[in-house]
């Protein structure tokens, strides 16, 4: 089958693969086409970094799926983290560091537990499993640190197939944020998701608290067919 690999420069590479191919195999094919050594390649699908020993079918990668290729840069860089008190912290990081890693570095410097940290860049809240390069955070970028006063909560999302997904959210999360979290877990694009709670379809710009969605509430996920109404 054919799959596509999109690079950060926007170039798209087409590969011939089989479902049983491992991620290592795919990286070798990319090396054959593009000359990039496998150890410098990170492949992302549905917000997840793909592990070398696993196969395409393990990740439910099907024909004409698009993977994203991020290069692991050698050597580190400095970034800045600005707190609400106006203090600026300097961190030594690598592009391949995850947001969790960055929060741990902040904990080492400032003693703030990672679960109380929210990091913002370009107006977006950064998610733990993603990397700095996923968000195009480069040397000398400035992140903003906001403290989570109350912890988050769990909610459930039930699909039409009967599967239930558990999400970590905050009352202040917008419906868009929730759809992004579902995309990270399930690979379903937000524009194909409709979320229903208490018989109402939820609108993107509104928050969970707007709809009185509390901990352990269950939302229902309905898929929008392409070309539908």
From Swiss-Prot:
Keywords tagged on the record: Cytoplasm, Isopeptide bond, Nucleus, Repeat, Ubl conjugation
GO cellular component: cytoplasm; nucleus
Covalent cross-link (Glycyl lysine isopeptide (Lys-Gly) (interchain with G-Cter in ubiquitin)), residues: 6, 11, 27, 29, 33, 48, 63
Glycyl lysine isopeptide (Gly-Lys) (interchain with K-? in acceptor proteins) crosslink site(s): 76
A Pfam family recorded for this sequence: ubiquitin
Positions of the propeptide removed during maturation: 229
PANTHER family: UBIQUITIN
Family, similarity comment: Belongs to the ubiquitin family.
Known function: Ubiquitin exists either covalently attached to another protein, or free (unanchored). When covalently bound, it is conjugated to target proteins via an isopeptide bond either as a monomer (monoubiquitin), a polymer linked via different Lys residues of the ubiquitin (polyubiquitin chains) or a linear polymer linked via the initiator Met of the ubiquitin (linear polyubiquitin chains).
Name assigned to this protein: Polyubiquitin
């Amino acid at each position: 089958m054919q799959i596509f690999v999109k690079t950060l420069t926007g170039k798209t590479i087409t590969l011939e693969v089989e479902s049983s191919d491992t991620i290592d195999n795919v990286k070798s094919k990319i090396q054959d086409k593009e000359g990039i050594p496998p150890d410098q390649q990170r492949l992302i699908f549905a917000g997840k970094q793909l592990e070398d020993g696993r196969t395409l079918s393990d990740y439910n990668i099907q024909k004409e799926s698009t993977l994203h290729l991020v290069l692991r840069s050698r050597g580190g860089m400095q970034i800045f983290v600005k707190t609400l008190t106006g203090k600026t912290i300097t961190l030594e990081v690598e592009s391949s560091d995850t947001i969790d890693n960055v929060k741990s570095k902040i904990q080492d410097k400032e003693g703030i537990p990672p679960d109380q940290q929210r990091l913002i860049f370009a107006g977006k809240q950064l998610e733990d499993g993603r990397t700095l390069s996923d968000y195009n955070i480069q040397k000398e970028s400035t992140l903003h640190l906001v403290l989570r006063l109350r912890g988050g909560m769990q909610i459930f999302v039930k699909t039409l197939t009967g599967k239930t997904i558990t999400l970590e959210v905050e009352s202040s999360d917008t419906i868009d944020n929730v759809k992004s979290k579902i995309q990270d877990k399930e690979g379903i694009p937000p524009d194909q998701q409709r979320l229903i709670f208490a018989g109402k379809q939820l609108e993107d710009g509104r928050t969970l608290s707007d709809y009185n969605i509390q901990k352990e509430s269950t939302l229902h996920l309905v898929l929008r067919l392409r070309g539908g109404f």
